[in-house]
């Protein structure tokens, strides 16, 4: 029985190219013969999804299939060269390589003489909040792989040259039969290099690279946040056999601050003041990250938790001219270890206090009294 190509891929008839490609890749992973050895059913399904995708990925074939179904491909219905088999030039093998090649050996590195891009590196750096505020230039030392200066990266001893691998003809890839189609694999003779080194370099032992610690200057811009990533292009490991270098990624973390807490570009802090300052009014000074001392006026009758805003005293916004604000929360301290005279004065103050001095507490206890008296009636 003929299969429905859309059902085979599990997609709607309106599916676009991206949906088709995603569906094919997912099913190809599930039913690939390498993952299902000696499983005829998986091989059958794998062939069906390959047939379906080869037809639907081609706009002309898809249009014909949508209009005529499988009849479009029978008895030469679409003219010469329009069959849906998986013949020698291209066909399903090429589809599989383009979409799914990494399953066959870790990515497509072919037709490049074995050149390989160097690995990316990660470097973790911790900065203070003050450094995050102002920015800085940091010197770091990174252990990495660099091109061997003895052999200039060839891996071969001075005076000798690598020879082209005869198994893959220098491509680093070989074709292997896989049931009804063929796929490319990494050449087992040269391990994908495309070259054979008979007389390796004594310094790098044929690798073309040596490990060395490098010193780099890193610009940390003002306003960076915890988790900010900085990319230094080409500062990763050196490539293999003439390949490009990888990149270096600096991952930044900001140390917790003793005084300030941060939320985006805004800063928050708590400032303790005495009970008398809160009641009578006064002022205090706070040090800000720009290095200045800012005087804050406290009005009389200030309550615990009162918040003051200092505009433009927060953190700079990364790569922008904007600056956040500083929010100061008042924390009123209750006096401790009172002297006899201090206690006498507070007791006298308590006797002279009225509801107007503490309207919230007086109102609260009055309402509480009324509540419990109402329960007893």
From Swiss-Prot:
Binds 2 Zn(2+) ions per monomer. Zn(2+) 1 binds at residues 148, 151, 201, 204. Belongs to the DnaJ family. This is Chaperone protein DnaJ. One of its GO terms (molecular function) is unfolded protein binding. Its cofactor is Zn(2+). One of its GO terms (biological process) is protein refolding. Homodimer. A zinc finger (CR-type) spans 135-213. It comes from the Bacteria. CXXCXGXG motif repeats lie at residues 148-155, 165-172, 187-194, 201-208. GO terms for cellular component: cytoplasm. It is found in: Cytoplasm. The J domain is necessary and sufficient to stimulate DnaK ATPase activity. Zinc center 1 plays an important role in the autonomous, DnaK-independent chaperone activity of DnaJ. Zinc center 2 is essential for interaction with DnaK and for DnaJ activity. Zn(2+) 2 binds at residues 165, 168, 187, 190.
């Amino acid at each position: 029985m003929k299969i429905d190509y859309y059902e085979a891929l599990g997609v709607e008839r309106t599916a676009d190219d991206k949906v088709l490609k995603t569906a094919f890749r997912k099913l190809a992973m599930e039913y690939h013969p390498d993952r299902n050895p000696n499983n005829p059913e998986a091989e059958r399904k794998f062939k069906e999804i390959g047939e379906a995708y080869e037809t639907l990925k081609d706009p002309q074939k898809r249009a014909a299939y949508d209009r005529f179904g499988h009849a479009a491909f029978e008895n030469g219905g679409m003219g010469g060269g329009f069959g849906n088999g998986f013949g020698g030039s291209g066909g399903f093998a090429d589809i599989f390589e383009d979409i799914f090649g990494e399953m066959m050996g870790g990515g497509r590195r072919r037709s490049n003489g074995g050149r390989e891009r160097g690995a990316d590196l990660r470097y973790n750096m911790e900065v203070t909040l003050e450094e995050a505020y102002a920015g800085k230039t940091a010197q770091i030392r990174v252990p990495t792989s660099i091109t061997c200066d003895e052999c200039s990266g060839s891996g071969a001893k001075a005076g000798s040259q690598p020879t082209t691998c005869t198994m893959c003809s220098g491509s680093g890839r070989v074709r292997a039969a896989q049931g009804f189609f063929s796929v490319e694999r990494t050449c087992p003779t040269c391990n994908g290099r495309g070259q054979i080194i008979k007389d390796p370099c004594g310094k790098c032992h044929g690798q073309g690279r040596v490990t060395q610690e490098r010193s780099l200057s890193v610009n940390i811009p003002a306003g960076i946040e915890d988790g900010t990533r900085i990319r230094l292009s080409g500062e990763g490991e050196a490539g293999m056999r003439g390949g490009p270098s990888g990149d270096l990624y600096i991952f930044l973390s900001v140390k917790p601050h003793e005084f300030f807490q941060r939320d985006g570009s805004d800063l928050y802090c708590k400032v303790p003041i005495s009970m008398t300052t809160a009641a009578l009014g006064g002022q205090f000074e706070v040090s800000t990250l720009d290095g200045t001392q800012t005087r804050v006026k406290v009005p009389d009758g200030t309550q615990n938790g009162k918040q003051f805003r200092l505009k433009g005293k927060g953190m700079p916004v990364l790569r922008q001219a904007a600056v956040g604000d500083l929010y100061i929360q008042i924390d009123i301290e209750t006096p401790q270890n009172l002297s006899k005279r201090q206690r006498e004065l507070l007791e006298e103050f308590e006797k002279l206090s009225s509801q107007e001095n503490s309207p919230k507490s007086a109102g609260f206890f009055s309402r509480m009294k009324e509540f419990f008296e109402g329960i007893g009636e």
